Amino acid sequence: MTPQAFTATVVGSPRIGPKRELKRATEGYWAGRTGRAELEKVAATLRRDTWAGLAAAGLDSVPVNTFSYYDQMLDTAVMLDALPERARQVSDDLDRYFAAARGNSDVAPLEMTKWFDTNYHYIVPEIAPTTKFALNPDKVLSELKEALAQGIPARPVVIGPITFLLLSKGVDGAGGPIERLEELVPIYAELLSLLADNGAQWVQLDEPALVTDMCADAPALAEAVYNKLGSAANRPAIYVATYFGDPGASLAGLARTPVEAIGVDLVYGPDTAVAAVPELAGKTVVAGVVDGRNVWRTDLAAALDKLTTLLGSAARVAVSTSCSTLHVPYSLEPETDLDDALRSWLAFGREKVAEVVTLARALRDGREAVADEIAASNAAVASRKSDPRLHNDRVRARIDSIVASGSHRGDPAQRRASQDARLHLPPLPTTTIGSYPQTSAIRKARAALRSGEIDQAEYERRMKKEIADVITLQEQLGLDVLVHGEPERNDMVQYFAEQLEGFFATQNGWVQSYGSRCVRPPILYGDVVRTHPMTVEWITYAQSLTDKPVKGMLTGPVTILAWSFVRDDQPLADTANQVALAIRDETVDLQAAGIAVIQVDEPALRELLPLRRADQEEYLRWAVGAFRLATSGVADSTQIHTHLCYSEFGEVIGAIADLDADVTSLEAARSHMEVLDDLNAVGFSNSVGPGVYDIHSPRVPSTAEIAESLRAALRAVPAERLWVNPDCGLKTRNPDEVSASLKNMVAAAHEVRAGV
């Protein structure tokens, strides 16, 4: 059967629901408030509505199997029967799935890390020597049948074998998972046959790992694997999707295989990639010309120029997003606070689908068929270029002056001596990362302020009560360096964005970060200006309640960029320095108010690292420079902390040392302190707090378990440089879990401290 050619599609779509319906349903299931049937009903409704919406918008090929209760890599591990043995102890299949993702009282979860250079996090499959791959196609077949029954032109989407293995982790003495590639090829061939038998005309195999340097042999592997899969006797047409960058030599390798279509990212990859591969002349090129991971409206005329150029290089050209629209909010429609100019510059998920359809129509019927849409696009481009909010000469001049004079602090040893004399901390000092649980009282107060039910003064009174409660709890637990708990912050980036000029905070711009965790990234559209102190009042109030040091809590410039939708009209380095200047001014004000410890979090340092090694040195240069610009305005006696998480740190370990923070806390519990060896390898000599327990799991770790982690850390870090802290902030945990876990953490620190 010859597959029906398609002209307009998207790589994938979000699954949380336009009103975060899936978040509420899964959290209700985890808490035992609802049953499996209700969760499955919500999921089925979301799938149905998503597919219907995409088809009604004009897509003639709709991705299915992009829905997930938690994560698509975890779904693929289930499909390949590759869950670890400890998760298999759970008898119910859905509970087993969630145990692998989140853990439970008996099962430690799988690791979680960043999905390439995005703010989405995936669950890292573990491949052991005993892992025996086998096909479990129930989910993908079920969703295909659902969609076809609905009359949807459905295209199942599955993570490809190369990407699955390169993003997995070998355990228990196993080598690199990619060594198992030959075992997966026949399983994928079996899957293709089943999909064809069940009515699939096309299948999409996602291979974003091909745009990275993760494997030097990737081009040859891609050609070998897809020669075999493309030669299968019974299969749908194969569309191999690459995204997030340039597939390089892998593109030519794929083009030499029998696959029918290849997707290329023409937003984050070069426009010339396709023209350089003559073998694509017989293929469908799925051209990712609409940005799937940022919120700016597409310049339709420029995109159409790219597409027109491609027509001479491929048998067919289909229009698509550059990647899944999972990374952007659902729609601009709920954003009623947007001014007309800013609204005209933006496109969220629904608007991006419309852009794809418009461009496909222009390719089919000519530019004159979409003349009105192109005119509106041109007007938006012109409006954005001329808006005075985009440039602030005073900010730019200040940055140039500080950078020219140098942004380095004093000698680390001298700083440590000065801080020791000021703080008088015990060996193995205990602290937490920053946030404490956002209670229902906090959420109700925030909602009441938004609705006008209470005024700002009453809101601040309630938040101060929450701060006082958190300070009291920490003192009762015996922590050494305290935090104020951040009750006034809905999000560690949005809180600052709402107070800085150059940002717009959305009302409903939710995107999935991991599992049920959703974030609302602000939009950074112009030059960044700090007009007033943002945290000083809250931190000094907390400090007034205790004699112990309370950390000032700030978000670093790179993380603010990584967790925002950032302007694309100037280099990221310039924007990072503008944010860094605002944070620098805040650190100076905190110090002037008597705060002795200031934490500038950079959990996203690894996230923005370019996927190709050739581009990484320049990024790390300006990222480190922005952090130092933000933190070099304070005295030696002020202790600067930073925190990093959610990442594999190996590729940025040298940069972590170059940040020159006095204390660096790191996510380390799930990876069993591996990061400490990496730090030692680059001569890291400042203090470090490797996370001693995993806060992303509801498990309460025992005192003995934490003490064991501390002793493991002491084998790599001397006691005078070791801090004791959880992996990450505690915002998403419930108060009982937090109290029990911290009680055990402090007890473990005292136990180990006694033996130092």
From Swiss-Prot:
Binding-site list for 5-methyltetrahydropteroyltri-L-glutamate: R20, E21, L22, K23, K114, R517, C518, W563, E607
The record's listing under InterPro entries reads: Cbl-indep_Met_Synth_N, Cobalamin-indep_Met_synthase, Met_Synth_C/arc, UROD/MetE-like_sf
Q: In the record's cofactor note, how is the cofactor described as bound?
A: Binds 1 zinc ion per subunit.
Which Enzyme Commission numbers does its entry carry? 2.1.1.14
Q: Which key words tag this protein in UniProt?
A: Amino-acid biosynthesis, Metal-binding, Methionine biosynthesis, Methyltransferase, Repeat, Transferase, Zinc
Q: Please list the residues that make up the active site.
A: H696 (proton donor)
Q: Which residues bind L-methionine?
A: I433, G434, S435, E486, D601
Q: Name one GO molecular function term.
A: 5-methyltetrahydropteroyltriglutamate-homocysteine S-methyltransferase activity
Q: State the Gene Ontology BP annotations.
A: methionine biosynthetic process; methylation
Which cofactor(s) does the record list?
A: Zn(2+)
- The residues the record assigns to binding Zn(2+) are H643, C645, E667, C728
Keyword Ion transport in record? no
- Pfam families cross-referenced by the UniProt entry: Meth_synt_1, Meth_synt_2
Q: Provide the residue positions that the database annotates as binding L-homocysteine.
A: I433, G434, S435, E486, D601
| Catalysed conversion reaction | 5-methyltetrahydropteroyltri-L-glutamate + L-homocysteine = tetrahydropteroyltri-L-glutamate + L-methionine
Pathway assignment reads: Amino-acid biosynthesis; L-methionine biosynthesis via de novo pathway; L-methionine from L-homocysteine (MetE route): step 1/1
Identify the HAMAP family for this entry. Answer: Meth_synth
Protein role: Catalyzes the transfer of a methyl group from 5-methyltetrahydrofolate to homocysteine resulting in methionine formation.
Q: Which family does it belong to?
A: Belongs to the vitamin-B12 independent methionine synthase family.
Instruction: From the Swiss-Prot or TrEMBL record, give the protein name.
Output: 5-methyltetrahydropteroyltriglutamate--homocysteine methyltransferase
Source species:
Mycobacterium avium (strain 104)
